Design a protein with these regions (language model features):
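Extracellular beta-strand-rich solenoid/capping regions of secreted or surface-exposed proteins
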Residues: 135-139
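Short, basic interhelical loop/turn and adjoining N-cap
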Residues: 31, 63-82
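Short boundary motifs at domain starts and secondary-structure transition points
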Residues: 107-111
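Single, function-defining residue in the core of a domain
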Residues: 1-56, 60, 73, 85-88, ...
Length: 398
């Protein structure tokens, strides 16, 4: 990227997309100003900057000459943006997302870090009952789900490569149908994905999985394996899962262990070439997808939706994931030691500045380091430097 230092950061990001921002697509036949790709780029800007509404996007475009120059668009109304978000073909955004994910996967393979784990889970986003009646789950809840597959090549190197949006009443099992496909990776799932018929099919297709089972799941021991002394593993066995009413045809492996809080976990797996300790550690990595969902909702525009129409919501979900992959690409290409959140924070401030100034800030070393004041090293002093306000002495002593 350094061979085009004169470019702004936003132009660098645009160059990563598989379609030119000024290209008119088939869907733009009758469009005069806001073409599909211009709208997509504007919504990616909204994700990066966390613009909260169509009105804020409208003002931001009028206020930023470099964004106007980039999009060749001086202004656009919030109502036009609202209509456009619902008109963008979701299949186009899904293809762009998969293109970026494929590039990320190729970089990982070149480094010898192909996807070792594929973590499957879903996260819900609530909708107002009055506006989200099409996604009602009960008289008190309405919303949508993001069913996600997260590729983990290392604890600090992970990225999404597949996503299925759905209404809130779609179960996790249904969402996993298209997310679990033949692969060399190990699929990691929590309770809620324990479908015996599907697990049988995975075993038959040589798909490796590690699933936490519900406590009520029945397992008949076929063969017990020795458990290492002094470890947190309490059982390692070959079992037959289910009862006479409903059961699996193929046998699987049962690994039981407890964590630091003495909580017990029952894991069913089709992986036989790893130790019980390794199986337990693989399942513990499932927490990474929880952290990833939290990162998306905190740092991108995902927790609060711009629209309450199905296609517009699906589009916003894919736009958030596309933005996350762009941030990951910048972090990888610059070879910075900073986290994705640190890179995103700098991107926000330097989005319309030169790439060179962004790199200077990204590579900047702390001016000085200090261990800080040690706890309890000095007396506690209540500092009040104003006559405004009332403080009543507390009766309670520390």
């Amino acid at each position: 990227m350094d061979n085009v230092k004169a470019k702004t950061v936003i132009r660098q990001l645009i160059s990563l997309l598989p379609i030119d921002v000024h290209q008119r697509l088939l869907f733009d036949h009758y469009t005069k100003k806001l073409t599909t790709m211009k709208a997509i780029m504007l919504f990616i800007n909204a994700q990066l900057k966390q613009w909260s509404s169509y009105g804020e996007m409208e003002i931001a475009l009028r206020a930023e000459p470099k964004l106007q120059q980039l999009l060749q668009l001086e202004s656009i109304s919030g109502s036009q943006l609202s209509r456009k978000l619902d008109q963008i073909p979701t299949e186009l955004l899904e293809w762009m997302f998969q293109h970026l994910a494929s590039q990320t996967q190729q970089r990982a393979c070149h480094q010898g870090q192909s996807g070792k784990l594929h973590i499957i889970d879903s996260s819900s986003i609530r909708l107002p009952l009055q506006l989200g009646s099409w996604a009602k789950m009960s008289n008190k809840s309405s919303g949508v789900k993001m069913h996600l597959r997260l590729v983990v090549t290392a604890p600090d190197k992970l990225f999404p490569d597949a996503m299925i949006p759905s209404s809130l009443n779609v179960g996790d099992r249904a969402g996993a149908v298209e997310l679990v496909v033949p692969s060399d990776a190990i699929y990691v799932m929590d309770r809620g994905y324990d479908d015996y018929a599907r697990m049988d099919q995975w075993v038959q297709d040589n798909i490796q999985f590690v699933i936490r089972m519900r406590d009520r799941a029945l397992a008949t021991v076929i063969e017990e394996y020795p458990v290492p002394e002094g470890s947190n593993i309490t059982r390692d066995a070959k079992v037959c899962v289910g009862s006479s009413f409903r059961s699996m045809e193929h046998s699987v492996r049962l690994v039981e262990f407890y964590d630091e809080q003495e909580r017990t976990y029952r894991i069913f797996t089709s992986v036989w070439d790893k130790t019980a300790e390794e199986i337990a550690q693989i399942y513990k990595n499932r927490w990474l997808i929880e952290l990833y969902f939290k990162w998306l909702k905190q740092h991108l525009r995902l927790k609060k939706l711009h629209s309450h129409k199905p296609q517009a919501i699906w589009n916003q979900l894919f736009l958030a994931l596309i933005t996350a992959l762009l941030v990951e690409h910048i972090r990888h290409s610059t070879q910075t030691a900073k986290t994705n959140w640190q890179v995103l924070r700098i991107l926000r401030e330097y989005l319309y500045r030169s790439w060179r100034s962004f790199r200077i800030e990204l590579d900047r070393k702390p001016s000085r380091s200090s261990p800080g004041r040690r706890p309890g090293s000095g007396p506690k002093v209540l500092s009040v430097r104003t006559m405004v306000g009332i403080i009543k002495p507390s009766k309670f002593k520390e």
